[in-house]
């Protein structure tokens, strides 16, 4: 299927998943939480435990595990790209090493303290061990969803802003990204990050992974940077792939095979030269609602195959009927090899009501909104309530 990259999201609030010898608490404490069920844990206090305490749930890859995985991938012509989250999504680190947070206490912050020089010592030490394990050209540093609230009142962060002549807290994230990029570049690696790394000014050689739609990727390539396209509406496989009532619990949304296949990673707004900077496309599967390896396979296949074909095919050569027929066969072949795929031949498909127009007295009338609607569910914008169109499984 010509899938040639595996991006491993190795750290997040739910647990630290890679052995770092210089910081043993990452695997003795930050890798273990109070409940195996993510939703129960997330809604129930979000606490961590030592690995040897009763009820501890979690785990991690040893460095020997990583070497074995990297070698297996190499034999199958796949490069593994590791991700170490910074500056946000770091609750687990800051519970184990609270001195790296603005508060200096566990369970207070999710973001590293950018004003603390020890933060950079920690991150560089971690990345040094990571680079020794992964030969990938790219090292992914996260960069998404930083809260930044603590930085506004943290004396160390405010001093950093003054010393570096920064005018907004967004620039603190940019400061961190620039420093980490230089460190990676000095070691012969490229920095890759989610599209929030554009905030405050993009690091000189950074590659942007565009997940909040395509805008971040387009901004990157039009300014001469590389981009990887992975917009949530087409590429996040933790959404339902069929009618939600027929599927295991998922994070929400509706992303069927056909929609993944419809994606074009290279925007028609780009020039030929800019298009060359779109280096690829990627599907993502976050596993908060995916508790077993079998469930992972179910969510991945066959939708991953659709993105693989999209990434390697010129848009004019794509044919949904042809791909769908081949996907049915691919599912049969994968199941024969022991994979637990989605049963494509039994797909329910779009919500029937979404294909039936609705007639009512307000059809086409202007709607006045007293409060803004949630942009995540914008649908058809101001005319959504009066356009006569019913929603699909997403909304």
Residues covered by each model-derived region:
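Substrate-binding groove of N-acetylhexosamine-processing glycoside hydrolases
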Residues: 68, 77, 120-138, 145, ...
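Generic domain-boundary/flexible-linker signal
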Residues: 17-19, 91, 150-152, 202, ...
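Surface-exposed, flexible loop/turn segments at secondary-structure boundaries
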Residues: 14-16, 88, 147, 199, ...
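Short, low-complexity intrinsically disordered segments
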Residues: 14, 30, 36-40, 149, ...
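Residues that line or immediately flank small-molecule/substrate-binding pockets and catalytic motifs
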Residues: 10, 285, 371
């Amino acid at each position: 299927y010509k899938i040639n990259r595996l991006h491993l999201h190795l750290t997040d609030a739910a647990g630290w998943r890679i052995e770092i010898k210089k910081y043993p608490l990452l695997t003795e404490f930050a890798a273990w939480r109070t409940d195996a069920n993510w939703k129960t844990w997330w809604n129930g206090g979000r606490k961590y435990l030592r690995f040897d305490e009763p009820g501890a749930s979690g785990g991690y890859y040893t460095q020997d595990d990583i070497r074995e995985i990297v070698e297996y991938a190499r034999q199958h012509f796949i490069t593994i790209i590791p991700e170490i989250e910074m500056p946000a999504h770091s609750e687990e680190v800051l519970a184990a090493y609270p001195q790296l947070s603005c508060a200096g206490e566990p369970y207070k912050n999710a973001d590293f303290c950018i004003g603390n020089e020890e933060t950079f010592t920690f991150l560089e030490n971690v990345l040094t061990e990571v680079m020794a394990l992964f030969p990938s050209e790219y090292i992914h540093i996260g960069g998404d969803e930083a809260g930044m609230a603590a930085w506004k009142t943290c004396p160390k962060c405010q001093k950093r802003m003054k010393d570096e002549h920064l005018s907004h807290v967004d620039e603190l994230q940019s400061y961190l990204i620039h420093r980490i990029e230089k460190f990676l570049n000095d070691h012969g690696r490229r920095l890759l990050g989610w599209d929030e790394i554009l905030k405050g000014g993009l690091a000189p050689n950074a590659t942007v992974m565009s997940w909040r739609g395509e805008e971040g990727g387009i901004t990157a390539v039009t300014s001469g940077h590389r981009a990887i396209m992975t917009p949530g509406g087409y590429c996040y496989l933790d959404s339902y792939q069929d009618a939600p009532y027929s599927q295991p619990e998922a994070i929400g949304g509706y992303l069927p095979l056909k929609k993944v296949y419809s994606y074009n990673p290279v925007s028609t707004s780009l020039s030929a030269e800019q298009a060359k900077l779109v280096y690829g496309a990627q599907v993502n599967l976050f596993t908060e609602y995916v508790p077993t390896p079998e469930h992972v396979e179910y969510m991945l296949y066959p939708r991953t195959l659709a993105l693989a074909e999209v990434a390697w095919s010129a848009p004019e050569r794509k044919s949904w009927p042809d791909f769908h027929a081949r996907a049915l066969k691919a599912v049969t072949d994968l199941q024969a090899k022991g994979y637990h795929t989605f049963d494509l031949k039994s797909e329910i498909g779009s919500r029937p009501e979404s294909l039936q127009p609705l007639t009512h007295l307000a059809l086409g009338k202007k709607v006045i909104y007293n409060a803004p609607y949630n942009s995540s569910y914008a649908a058809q914008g101001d005319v959504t309530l009066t356009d006569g169109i019913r929603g699909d499984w997403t909304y």
